[in-house]
Every structure is written in structure tokens, then in C-alpha cells.
């Protein structure tokens, strides 16, 4: 992991400017971790094909590079992971009332202004995904392994109020993302994730409701 401090500013009402984060290396190794498949049940299993996802991620990176021409190609995974991080903060739920507009971060001395509209427009207009219901979630689910690998190396990123509402402990706030498939979670991450769902329901007086789909969690976006 790089020792260089990364400056991150979330452009929304709740987030303080100047959050410092530590950036991960731009390459991510594959993650092969045990999970009990009976612990998390998902009804929403839509994902892109490998070819569709590669094409979309290439378009996302090229769009960002069009705004910042000096970005090295080797950083593509890192740049896509930052977009996935933004998706986790915003929530992919169609019920989300998030009003965030993007972030500004610095990597290797280069400041990048990552507008949410820049990457969401690319996803919505993609031929392989744009015509699907909630295209952002389909893209997020397809890339959740990249998201998890990135977040495990950057555990101090800010996700707003949702992780606190859910009682997610420090260092695991990335589990508030509502596009996770459940695959690749460690046993501890799985336990935290399930506990968070139960906590959100209890805080809203819905003890008799069972969450069987991460789509139900996105609406819990603010305190």
C-alpha cells in the first residue's frame, strides 16, 4: 500500500472537506475467501457479462482520462474503484435522496475532480446496461470484488451516516454498500453485514421485517 496521503473531499452537506485517505496500489489481486452461502440470501443477482463489464469499465476510464489526460493506464483499476466507492456513498437505491455531487482526490501528486455525473452518465448510456432497471446497481454488483479489494486497503474512507446508523464498526464501513453480492466476504465481514441489516430495521421499528435483498438497504442513506 502506498504511503502517500490522499486528500479526499466529499461534496455533500454532511461531509467535511480535506479527509485524508491512504491510496492502495492500482493493481488488485484476486480474493478467494470462505463464506457460508446460507448466511446471506440475494434475490437481485443481475450482473454484466465479463465482456460487457470490461467494455464499460474501459469507457469509464477513458471518459475520466478525457478530463485528466495525464492519468496512466496502469491506474485504471484504482480509478474505477474510486467510482465504486462513490456509488457506495451515494447508494444505488432508486429510493435514495442523496444530494452528493462528487469528490476531489489526489494521487501521486495529481488532483482529480471526480464528478458523479461524469461516471453515472457513462453507465446509464452504456449499450450493455443502460436499458436495465437500476443500471448503477447492476454495474456495482458486477464489480464488487474490485470494490472489496480496494476498500480493504483503504479502511478509513468516509461513507457518511449510513454505516453509523447500521452500527458498522470502524474499518468496515465499506460494508454499507447496497450492491454487494455476498460472494468473497470473510466470515467476519459476513457477520458484520448481517448485523448491520438487523440494526437498520430495528432503528426503524421494523423488527418483523426480514431483509433478503440488499436493494432494501439503500434507502437508509442518511441519519
Swiss-Prot record:
Keyword annotations: Capsid protein, Helical capsid protein, Virion
Cellular compartments annotated: Virion
Sequence segments annotated as region (Disordered): 1-21
Top-level taxon: Viruses
Bias (Basic and acidic residues): 1-19
InterPro entries, per database record: Closter_coat
Modification after translation, per record: Consists of at least two size variants, CP1 and CP2, which result of post-translational proteolysis at sites approximately 12 to 15 and 26 AA from the N-terminus respectively.
Keyword hit for NAD: no
Pfam families on file: Closter_coat (PF01785)
UniProt GO cellular component terms: helical viral capsid
UniProt keyword annotation of Membrane present: no
UniProt family annotation: Belongs to the closteroviridae capsid protein family.
The name this protein goes by in its record: Capsid protein
Species this protein is from: Citrus tristeza virus (isolate T36)
Species classification: Viruses, Riboviria, Orthornavirae, Kitrinoviricota, Alsuviricetes
Amino acid at each position: 500500500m502506498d504511503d502517500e496521503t490522499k486528500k479526499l473531499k466529499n461534496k455533500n452537506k454532511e461531509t467535511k472537506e480535506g479527509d485524508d485517505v491512504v491510496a492502495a496500489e492500482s493493481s488488485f489481486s484476486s480474493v478467494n475467501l470462505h463464506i457460508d452461502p446460507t448466511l446471506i440470501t440475494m434475490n437481485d443477482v443481475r450482473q454484466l457479462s465479463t465482456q460487457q463489464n470490461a467494455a464499460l469499465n474501459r469507457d469509464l476510464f477513458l471518459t475520466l482520462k478525457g478530463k485528466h489526460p495525464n492519468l496512466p493506464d496502469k491506474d485504471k483499476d484504482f480509478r474505477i474503484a474510486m467510482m465504486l466507492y462513490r456509488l457506495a456513498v451515494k447508494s444505488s437505491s432508486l429510493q435514495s435522496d442523496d444530494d452528493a455531487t462528487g469528490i476531489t482526490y489526489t494521487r501521486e501528486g495529481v488532483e482529480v475532480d471526480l464528478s458523479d455525473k461524469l461516471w453515472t452518465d457513462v453507465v446509464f448510456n452504456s449499450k450493455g446496461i443502460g436499458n436495465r432497471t437500476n443500471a448503477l446497481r447492476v454495474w456495482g454488483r458486477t464489480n464488487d470484488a474490485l470494490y472489496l479489494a480496494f476498500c480493504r486497503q483503504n479502511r478509513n474512507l468516509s461513507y457518511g451516516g449510513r454505516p453509523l446508523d447500521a452500527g458498522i464498526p470502524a474499518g468496515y464501513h465499506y460494508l454499507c454498500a447496497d450492491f454487494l453480492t455476498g460472494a468473497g466476504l470473510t466470515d467476519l465481514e459476513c457477520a458484520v453485514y448481517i448485523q448491520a441489516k438487523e440494526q437498520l430495521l430495528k432503528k426503524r421499528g421494523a423488527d418483523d421485517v426480514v431483509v433478503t435483498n440488499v436493494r432494501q438497504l439503500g434507502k437508509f442513506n442518511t441519519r
